[in-house]
């Protein structure tokens, strides 16, 4: 909300400067977003009057003006403005004046004629962008008066950023009320004595929807002059508040709305075809608004109708059919209390907002309607003339403001400072909050303009605002604290992040709420955790997997010509679990495990001249996953399985010590195509708890003896996983003390016979390499051969293997 400081100080004028006033308002919760001067700095510009004007002897478009600047002698000034005329009052930049932008005015000759100064347009003074002609000033101004004083150009424009709960401050008077409370300065309320009722004409009104309109007041005014000029003081205030002048009747309505926060509407009485009714709209009804927009109505929108013709969108905007024009002679002035819930969101449905709807959907004072009707009427009669009829004021359903109790002890506990009882009483008095003291409690009845006071904490906030947040001492919280030792065998979240980052992955953070389609496509989840009030319609469910969010970021980067992307996210997912009860960090029925997910797309390594380019594959990312587990990687198993997000033939379930902990694989071809990626990303998702546990290293003496390497090739069933044979080897080493010298075993070759037409290959050859080493003695050939034989026997027994010749 924007307004000039001078308007505010006409209602309350504390003895503090502009900067201090802005600071006080901001610290009280009315954030002053910006202050700027009403006009840029300039000097030497005065009010002047053109006494005589003559054509320039040597230029058709220039004229020679004789100007009275109040000095007693006429100045000769050459001017080319089309509106220059004798008798016109205009700004004059005298010789030596400095205009905005640093322009200095001196004596000059223009086509041979001396010019001692410059007559100015509004743009040359930085007041507006209008440069079509000279700025025309009121004729009542005295020549020689400094233009800054004459037009009050040393004013300051305040821009407030109000929170939605402070609807009472959406007016100059509302802000003035706050300033008076903060500074103790007397407040002058805008008011007008009831105007004489000189006609008895009434327009009948029926309120058919009390849940829409709680109070409706109006009066007929006849014989107005709609062509009357809006006073300069009113136009200036409106312009400095960001409103353009339209016509006297419209300007008066806007002026009162800005000054006291009362939206009103002026109907052209002669265009109203019947009695007025206030009701909810009906299906099929339409209305052309004042902004030229035609809207289709429905029963969720309130309207004012004349007979059966809709004339106004209740609390939002009037209709074009009954709008006032310069030819209007008779008007109906209306002001009403519209229930905030009946107005909220209605204007946004039609993709616009109005000053009226902005106020009504937050709450407008319902008790001061008659006084404001009188204020508007007085301005209309003073400016446009006319005769006023009686006020028709109907109250059918007004809010009932329940008293709110504030315990003084509770106030002290919340604020952390003991505000004296007498000071609390003084604060409530200055804020205009009627109260009763009951023991140590204050029972406050919220005024009709304070829709934000409903609970005890609201009153405590009022005390804090006026008492002053800066007066509340900074006291560190005192609480029992106990440092818990982190087990050495457990890693924290930051340690895991560092591990993943060391594998060349970059961390991202996605929303926890996602599209419902993502859950269906990527996680196969039909039991969704839906949001009651999503921040956006497409972010309506809680995620049960991190994979979809990572794929979306890969797509985002691919669309921006990135060729290699490696990302990870550590975050919570959400699963339905009827067995889960409420807890300090749990919500009943929803399990929230912490998961780690990663995605690799593009080159396996950064582009480099000495390394052939190839796309990242399953085994590259499998190696990354194994590296994250360190010494526990030997307990990992990658079991071929299917997952909705992954390629059915290139995905694996990850198990640790026999328990499933996640998934690894290429993205499903369907989702790869849907994301418009030219090759499939490889993704993984792991349970964080499995990663957090780690095996501590066991220190042992480094052997001084040479290692012996032996190979063993065996024929086995073609469908037998190599990991099954490695598990058999590990089990044999664990149970046979003679095999303790076997330090490592790896598969180094897989070979299959070339298939013959019509026959299926049933066997494959797996070649294993073993490293044997003793810490005490050098192994002889007999011991090595015995170890290899024992391993071969175990494999033959377990898998029906036979040695390859």
Curated annotation (Swiss-Prot):
What is the catalytic activity of this protein?
tRNA(Phe) + L-phenylalanine + ATP = L-phenylalanyl-tRNA(Phe) + AMP + diphosphate + H(+)
The protein's required cofactor(s) are namely:
Mg(2+)
Task: Give GO BP annotations, semicolon-separated.
Answer: phenylalanyl-tRNA aminoacylation
Q: Which GO terms describe its cellular component?
A: phenylalanine-tRNA ligase complex
Q: What class of enzyme is it?
A: ligase
Residue ranges of every copy of the tRNA-binding domain listed in the record = 39-148
Tell me the ranges covered by the B5 domain, including all copies.
399-474
Q: What positions does the domain FDX-ACB occupy?
A: 703-804
One Pfam family per UniProt = FDX-ACB
Which branch of life, at top level? Bacteria
Q: What InterPro entries would the database entry show?
A: aa-tRNA-synth_II/BPL/LPL (IPR045864), B3/B4_tRNA-bd (IPR005146), DNA-bd_dom_put_sf (IPR009061), Fdx_antiC-bd (IPR005121), Fdx_antiC-bd_sf (IPR036690), NA-bd_OB-fold (IPR012340), Phe-tRNA-ligase_IIc_bsu (IPR045060), Phe-tRNA-ligase_IIc_bsu_bact (IPR004532)
**Compartments it resides in:** Cytoplasm
Q: Where does Mg(2+) bind?
A: 452, 458, 461-462
- Cofactor comment: Binds 2 magnesium ions per tetramer.
Which HAMAP family does this entry report, sorted A to Z?
Phe_tRNA_synth_beta1
Q: Which PANTHER family match?
A: PHENYLALANINE--TRNA LIGASE BETA SUBUNIT, PHENYLALANYL-TRNA SYNTHETASE BETA CHAIN AND LEUCINE-RICH REPEAT-CONTAINING PROTEIN 47
What NCBIfam families does the entry give? pheT_bact, YtpR
Subunit structure as annotated in this protein's UniProt entry: Tetramer of two alpha and two beta subunits.
- Its recorded name reads Phenylalanine--tRNA ligase beta subunit
Source organism per UniProt: Bordetella parapertussis (strain 12822 / ATCC BAA-587 / NCTC 13253)
The organism's taxonomy opens as: Bacteria, Pseudomonadati, Pseudomonadota, Betaproteobacteria, Burkholderiales
What's the encoding gene here? pheT
